[in-house]
């Protein structure tokens, strides 16, 4: 029986929970940071740990956990390349919610950027749902995923701890998106191996890598909240995350073996559309423009 429709519905519900969770966490990070301007990479370890004492941040975390439950359930019912991109719906919800909360009027370029993200990812899902299929996961395939993820975690871990205070929002968002793309893949892998009756030490290793990925990705996300609006953060996660997950699913896990050259071109075009939306959002969102003006004014005052 085909459960793709149900899986997409569950992913949509999870996206709504993710949007509200992101807004709550973003507000809590702003309160914790005590900032008048947003500076990239400005969260210290003490500030991150301080979030654990903030009810608003905990409420946001709870909503994100609910979103993950729906996402994991959806992943158990349909291929990764169908489920993961549906999260782009969270971008629309987050943008409207943040505009209302922050009393920010979205400009035309921001609306265009959101539209590009949603159309790009929506088209991606439509194509993926027609050619995606489950495969039997071998140990060799799993080792490939783990090896690549280990390199990714080391690279981004070094980048965060060496250059964190100098990074802009788009870099934190990209890092979080790439890491969570692997986290989504490992989640799907663990579900598959349990269903296939292969729960052994390699599966436990996957779970350990998943936990490390969630922790490091979470650090990137909190710093992204400290340096950009929540809809930009969600845009990065709901575009970069699924793109990475789908790339892994298609090239390593073989979920897109039925794709012909025309389909692949479509994937690339839709991916480019969505990524363009994220880049536009990172440059022209009203809150980003306001941050740039404040930063320029602050720099001017320091020179006087």
Predicted regions mapped to residue ranges:
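Polytopic alpha-helical membrane proteins, predominantly small-molecule transporters/carriers
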Residues: 1-304
């Amino acid at each position: 029986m085909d459960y793709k429709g149900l899986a997409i519905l569950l992913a949509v519900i999870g996206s709504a929970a993710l949007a509200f969770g992101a807004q709550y966490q973003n507000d809590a990070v702003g309160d914790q940071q005590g900032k008048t301007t947003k500076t990239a990479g400005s969260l210290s370890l003490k500030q991150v740990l301080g979030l654990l004492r903030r009810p608003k941040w905990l409420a946001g975390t709870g909503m994100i956990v609910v979103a993950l439950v729906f996402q994991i359930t959806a992943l158990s019912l349909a291929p990764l390349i169908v489920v993961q991109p549906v999260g782009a719906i969270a971008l629309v919800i987050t943008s409207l919610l943040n505009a209302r909360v922050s009393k920010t009027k979205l400009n035309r370029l921001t609306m265009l950027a959101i539209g590009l993200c949603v159309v790009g990812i929506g088209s991606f899902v439509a194509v993926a749902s027609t050619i995606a299929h489950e495969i039997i996961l071998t140990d060799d395939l799993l080792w490939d995923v783990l090896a690549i993820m280990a390199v990714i975690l080391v690279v981004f871990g070094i980048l965060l701890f060496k250059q964190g205070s100098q990074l802009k929002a788009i870099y934190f968002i990209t890092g979080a998106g790439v890491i969570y793309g692997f986290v989504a893949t490992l989640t799907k892998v663990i579900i598959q191996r349990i269903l296939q009756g292969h729960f052994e030490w390699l599966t436990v290793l996957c779970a350990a890598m998943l936990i490390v990925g969630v922790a490091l990705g979470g650090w990137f996300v909190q710093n992204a909240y400290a340096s950009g609006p929540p809809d930009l953060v969600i845009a990065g996660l709901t575009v970069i995350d699924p793109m990475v997950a789908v790339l892994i699913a298609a090239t390593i896990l073989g979920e897109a073996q039925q794709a012909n050259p025309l389909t692949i071109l479509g994937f690339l075009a839709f991916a480019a559309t969505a990524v363009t939306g994220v880049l536009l959002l990172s440059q022209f969102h009203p809150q980003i423009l306001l941050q740039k003006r404040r930063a320029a004014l602050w720099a001017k005052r320091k020179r006087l």
